Amino acid sequence: MKSAYLNDEFFSRLETLALNLRADLSGYFGGKHFVRSYGQTVEFADYREYQLGDDIRRIDWNLYSRFEKYFIRLFTDERQMDVQIFLDCSASMGKENRGKAAYAVSVAAALGFLSVHNMDKVSFKLIKEGAVEDPFGTIIGKNTFFRAISILENIDFSEDADISEAVTSCVNTGSNNGLSVIISDFLTRKDWKKAIDYLTYKKRQVLVLQLLSPDEVDPAYSGRVNLIDVESGDIGDPRNMKLKITRSLQLAYQEALRDLKADIKSFCTSRGADFISVTTDKPIERMLFGELLKAGIME
């Protein structure tokens, strides 16, 4: 499942962007995210009067010559953001639609690249059934990132996924130190809201990305059809349906899809999370440089 997006030209265009975290970070130093505290970087922030125990190397002697008082220079604190990308690997995300699978992997890779390019750390957490697989661990640096991507392009999309069970059972979600992204189509009867509640409880900034194929947004079926649940693949599954596609049924489907999107958006807004729904025929660059910039996720 090689993606046409994942090439040097694509990644070079991403180098002009950065992920934006709206909250202060706790955690590791060494990234490019400024927080409202003083630290060890070289970017000047302010002055204050010298106090016993301060580093005398920070005394500004020019100010001393003017005011005959000791002032020390304060510098901004930069910290490293922890970016966690939860990727729904259920069958509906790509078993029968390799283009949708490649798009999902490309979006995950783009967000991961932005993380390591800005000296942050990233992990790809694959949601399979009710568990999370973390095949690469924490990734820091582009060499490790590109090795992970070469493997990520070949992951298997199959069976079902329980987003809430997987995320809430994940042992390394961190706390108050970064961004959690959930990439899924959310075409499931299983609960997904507990996952968002759990991550916001952990004081994570949350981005929910819904990916839908054009056929899922506007199905081209007509006449009599036999719909088989892709996540079970079982022709005897009670969720399968025999339908006669009529105009009224098409309109009912589109209304149900609008209701689903509205429900996700409303819930995310109530929890302080961001929600973006994207059709997979939309160029990824337009989504990154358009939707995510507009939402303030990137800068």
Which residue stretches match the model-derived regions?
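Von Willebrand factor
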Residues: 144-178, 190, 212
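Short, electropositive alpha-helical surface patch
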Residues: 137-150, 293
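Von Willebrand factor type A / integrin I
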Residues: 1-36, 46, 172-178, 188-190, ...
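An amphipathic, basic-hydrophobic helix/alpha-beta surface used to engage anionic
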Residues: 1-135, 139, 179-182, 189, ...
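Short amphipathic alpha-helical interaction patches enriched in hydrophobic/aromatic residues
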Residues: 93, 152-156, 272-275
